[in-house]
């Protein structure tokens, strides 16, 4: 429940359209393991702010390879959508997320203060 509440806190609200999105849920034995969102047709400045792909894995299921598999699937979907590259971001201290991005071909392109939390974020590009 705490994990779901955290997801709700980070959900954007309002009428502003930020492009189109696909949301994938990862279940195992009827239990939500993780979720992933592909945000496509975003204006470029938003790609570099919120990323084209976002994902999260239930804390008890982390470090089991779920995020790597989810991101791999998302990249296949992005190719099918005709995307040539995707931008992903994570907090600098989120080593697990950085490893997930790197395992899927990510290349670090920028490091800057996060627009929401005042924390340092790293941004990666994955060429498709």
Predicted features and spans:
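Conserved GNAT acetyl-CoA-binding A-motif
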Residues: 78-89
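Hydrophobic residues in beta-strands and at strand termini
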Residues: 57, 90, 126-128
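Conserved beta-strand-loop-alpha-helix junction that forms the acyl-donor binding cleft
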Residues: 88-98
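Conserved catalytic-core motifs of GNAT/GCN5-like acyltransferases
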Residues: 89-90, 105-122
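Conserved acetyl-CoA-binding loop-helix of GNAT-fold acetyltransferases
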Residues: 54-57, 63-76, 80, 99-103
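Short coil/turn motifs at secondary-structure junctions
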Residues: 41-43, 60, 93
């Amino acid at each position: 429940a705490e994990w779901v509440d955290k997801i709700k806190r980070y959900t954007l609200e309002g009428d502003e359209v930020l492009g189109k999105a696909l949301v994938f849920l990862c279940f195992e034995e009827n239990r939500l393991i993780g979720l992933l969102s592909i945000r496509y047709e975003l204006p470029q400045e938003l790609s570099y702010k919120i990323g084209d792909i976002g994902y999260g894995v239930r804390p008890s299921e982390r470090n089991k390879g779920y995020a790597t598999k989810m991101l791999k699937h998302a990249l296949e979907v992005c190719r099918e959508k005709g995307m040539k590259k995707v931008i992903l971001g994570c907090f600098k201290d989120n080593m697990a997320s950085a490893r997930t991005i790197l395992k899927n071909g990510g290349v670090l392109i920028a490091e800057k203060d996060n627009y929401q939390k005042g924390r340092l974020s790293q941004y990666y590009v994955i060429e498709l």
